Design a protein with these regions (language model features):
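Bacterial N-terminal signal peptides that target proteins for export
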Residues: 2-12
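Bacterial N-terminal signal peptides
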Residues: 11-22
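N-terminal secretory signal peptides
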Residues: 27-103
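Short, flexible beta-strand-to-coil junctions
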Residues: 90-98, 108-109, 118-121
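A short, surface-exposed beta-strand/turn
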Residues: 102-112
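A short, surface-exposed interaction/processing loop segment used at functional sites
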Residues: 110-136
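C-terminal partner/receptor-binding element of secreted or periplasmic proteins
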Residues: 126-182
């Protein structure tokens, strides 16, 4: 009986050894699959346009000494989507008083921007005819997208902080990297 008992113990030990050796290998392959982005395509979430901005909700931000317009972001419209897009309404004002209001998005991961809609005088939105993702230009006279991305929204291809952190940076004119703006 002790031989059978010993045989069962050896068999159990062998089974346990096999069991404990296999899961790490399986776990490793699952771990690698979880981070394998090849073949996975990014998908943008459905868009909900915000209300057009009120002047009391606008946060002005500095773009550059060569900017030909002044810019402000509507704090009520700022959102961070589950798709990794920061969406916001921006108001561009010329020295003569003309205003352009647009609802836009920035993807930190790809350093791209997109215009979703433009405000009409009656407070409604007109969808952009060119709603494609485009590279952000940092060296134009009006480089508001580059300023928002590098100074307030993005760091190392990731969103830098949550909604409230970004709003605090904008309100205090405290860029992420003090050498790049402010």
């Amino acid at each position: 009986m002790s031989l059978n008992h010993r045989g069962a113990a050896v068999l159990t030990a062998a089974a346990l050894a096999a069991f404990f050796c296999m899961p790490p290998a399986l776990a490793q392959s699952q771990f690698e699959e979880d981070f394998d982005d090849t073949g996975k395509t990014w998908q943008e979430i459905a868009l909900q346009l915000p209300a057009t901005p009120s002047s009391e909700n606008l946060i002005p931000f500095y773009v550059s000494p060569t900017a030909t317009q002044n810019f402000a972001l509507d704090e009520k419209s700022l959102s961070i989507g589950k798709d990794g897009v920061i969406r916001y309404t921006i108001v561009a004002s010329s020295p003569a008083g003309a205003k352009n209001v647009s609802y836009e998005g920035i993807r930190c991961e790809t350093f791209e921007r997109k215009s979703y809609a433009f405000a009409r005088a009656d407070g409604t939105w007109a969808r952009s005819r060119r709603d494609q993702w485009e590279p952000i230009v940092r060296n134009a006279a009006n480089r508001q997208h580059g300023t928002l991305a590098t100074d307030f929204f993005c760091e190392s291809k990731s969103i830098s902080g949550n909604r409230e952190t970004i709003l605090q940076r904008l309100r205090g004119n405290q860029p992420i990297n003090t050498r790049s703006g402010g």
